[in-house]
């Protein structure tokens, strides 16, 4: 395998996210195919790290360069960011960080700019202390776009700084123990026998946080389906849903299938229909079902038009993990900060309400619908459910909040989990 310059690959990945609006989960895997297994982790660290601290790196470039890099030289802008990130946030020796970053100019066919890159990075090293002192008083220090900061400040006047701080951390690795194979405690013993350790969640019975992240192939019984990687807060959805054997259950917006398989672990005799609008992502649902040795009906379909994929069918329980801004999982997907726009929130809220209204008639009388998002914004959460309850006379809220303040909102970092919202509705 030809030796690749990781800094240039990271710069290209970040450029595709920020300039072209592509998701890092789509951009990164093809680039990782080009590098050795040893280098995959560093490439990922550089991409995630630059996107996590982008506001800081952009601020530094504006301070140290008189004019922005544009056109075909734009990738160099991101290459310099990769250089700053290494000097500030990694243990890579500065001389190696500088040399590899400067060499990255050759890999992106801009060798004439090696001197410029070297000069900017060395200037930063000389002025680092003064620059960081000034940065610490700027709005950029929060590492969030200003539109999102304003929304968080308005919705959480006393908590917004804690939310921002949690969003800027590296996420822990949560697992879901498959209760059809092992209890959480018995699998934890296997984990400890393998030289690792984990900590159980206080509320969600299958959730276990690893002491430090590990590759999945090192986890006891991963290939056999004994355990799944899933954040604790995502596991809350099925706790609220409380599926039972023999029931017909709809998992709507199901990809990549983590909640589909969790439903089947909790109720192995349930009949589950998993539906998602994104055909490509449905392949992940099949993969998850196969690894865990489970069966469900999987269909491509738009939640706004259920008659197209389920006819007149009605369900005992529906889990609607609605499309949302994903503002609760920024620490896990830092590209979200730069992919979302303020105007997206109203559009997402409209889509959520359309799906809720369309799917409600497909819930049996006496049935349960759990509405969930990985957002922290009230427009997508409590306000969404409040409006739905007002226009839907046969819907009643149960066990999640109050009619005036419906739902349960987990904030990022609470018991080390992601930000998530849940509302449990019963059809009268």
From Swiss-Prot:
**Which terms does the record give in the GO molecular function aspect?**
RNA binding; rRNA (cytosine-C5-)-methyltransferase activity
- Return the EC number: 2.1.1.176
- The signal peptide, as residue positions, is none
Q: Name one GO biological process term.
A: regulation of DNA-templated transcription
Query: Does this UniProt record's set of keywords contain ATP-binding?
Result: no
The entry's S-adenosyl-L-methionine-binding residues are 253-259, 276, 302, 321
- Which keywords does this Swiss-Prot/TrEMBL entry list? Cytoplasm, Methyltransferase, RNA-binding, rRNA processing, S-adenosyl-L-methionine, Transferase
**Lipid metabolism found in the keyword field:** no
Q: Identify which top EC class this enzyme belongs to.
A: transferase
Q: Which residues form the active site?
A: 374
Q: What InterPro entries has UniProt attached to this entry?
A: MeTrfase_RsmB-F_NOP2_cat, MeTrfase_RsmB-F_NOP2_dom, NusB-like_sf, NusB_RsmB_TIM44, RCMT, rRNA_ssu_MeTfrase_B, rRNA_ssu_MeTfrase_B_ent, RsmB-like_ferredoxin
Q: Cite a GO CC annotation.
A: cytosol
Reactions that this protein is recorded to catalyse:
cytidine(967) in 16S rRNA + S-adenosyl-L-methionine = 5-methylcytidine(967) in 16S rRNA + S-adenosyl-L-homocysteine + H(+)
Q: What does it do?
A: Specifically methylates the cytosine at position 967 (m5C967) of 16S rRNA.
The family note in this entry says:
Belongs to the class I-like SAM-binding methyltransferase superfamily. RsmB/NOP family.
Q: Which HAMAP family match?
A: 16SrRNA_methyltr_B (MF_01856)
Q: Spell out the NCBIfam families in the cross-references.
A: PRK10901.1, PRK14902.1, rsmB
Identification of the protein by name: Ribosomal RNA small subunit methyltransferase B
The organism is Citrobacter koseri (strain ATCC BAA-895 / CDC 4225-83 / SGSC4696)
| Primary gene name | rsmB
